[in-house]
Amino acid sequence: MRKLLIQIIRLYQRFISPLTPPSCRFYPTCSAYGIEAIETHGAIKGSYLAIKRILKCHPFHPGGVDPVPECQHTKHKKTP
């Protein structure tokens, strides 16, 4: 599922985005944010974060730098 969502975003970046003027108010762009969010948090939470970000992309939001939040869970190594 993760790979499929990333491929859809990459298709958008390659074929649709070049046809429109640059208008993203954020860094990284919303599509780059979506890919990073899905890679970092998985398909469900990453998609949620990407949609939440896209909904903030409008003329009344100041934009700016908005990095993908770090993963909150940590994996514990078992020690012998």
UniProtKB/Swiss-Prot annotation:
Pfam families: YidD. It comes from the Bacteria. GO terms for cellular component: plasma membrane. The keyword Metal-binding does not apply. The keyword Nuclease does not apply. Belongs to the UPF0161 family. HAMAP family: UPF0161_YidD (MF_00386). NCBIfam families: membrane protein insertion efficiency factor YidD. This is Putative membrane protein insertion efficiency factor. It comes from Shouchella clausii (strain KSM-K16). The lineage of its organism: Bacteria, Bacillati, Bacillota, Bacilli, Bacillales.
